[in-house]
From Swiss-Prot:
One of its GO terms (cellular component) is cytosolic large ribosomal subunit. InterPro entries: Ribosomal_uL15 (IPR030878), Ribosomal_uL15/eL18 (IPR021131), Ribosomal_uL15/eL18_sf (IPR036227), Ribosomal_uL15_bac-type (IPR005749). One of its GO terms (biological process) is translation. Binds to the 23S rRNA. Transmembrane segments: none annotated. This is Large ribosomal subunit protein uL15. It comes from Vesicomyosocius okutanii subsp. Calyptogena okutanii (strain HA). NCBIfam families: rplO_bact.
Length: 144
């Protein structure tokens, strides 16, 4: 096998459709656009979602729910992630330093997921009931 003998598999490379090249081609003259009408004109296509003057689906259906702006600045950290840290005194800045949360996060909640095997002190961080019990079980503490 040489580089000059390599070729794509049969049917792998599809040639582009050449329109307007005579009636014998099957797509000559009107080029597959039919006769007259908006779709046959240059630039003549409706915008996406246009239903011929009927109220479009995205406007017929009601708006639903909302996106909380607090969720943008809120994140959660698991106990197993805290267990991997070397610090014993933990604040939000420690999480940012270890890339557990992004820099725009202002509120963090620790959730009970995984295990914690050493005592840590959490300050200024919200904690779920289960996570608080797990931290206090290994002689750790949580303070607001």
């Amino acid at each position: 096998m040489q580089l000059n003998t390599l070729s794509p598999a049969q049917g792998e490379k599809k040639s582009r459709k050449r329109v307007g090249r005579g009636i014998g081609s099957g797509i000559g003259k009107t080029c597959g656009s039919g006769h007259k009408g908006q779709k046959s004109r240059s630039g003549g296509f409706n915008k996406i979602g246009f239903e011929g003057g009927q109220m479009p689906l995205q406007r017929r259906l009601p708006k639903v729910g909302f996106s909380s702006r607090i969720s943008i600045i809120t994140s959660q950290v698991t106990l197993s992630e805290i267990n991997r840290l070397t610090e014993t005194y933990i604040t939000i800045d420690v999480f940012k330093a270890h890339n557990l949360i992004t820099k725009n996060i202002k509120r963090v909640k620790v959730i009970l997921s995984g295990e914690i095997t050493r005592a840590v002190t959490l300050t200024g961080i919200k904690v779920t009931k289960g996570a608080k019990l797990a931290i206090e079980a290994v002689k750790g503490s949580v303070s607001d």
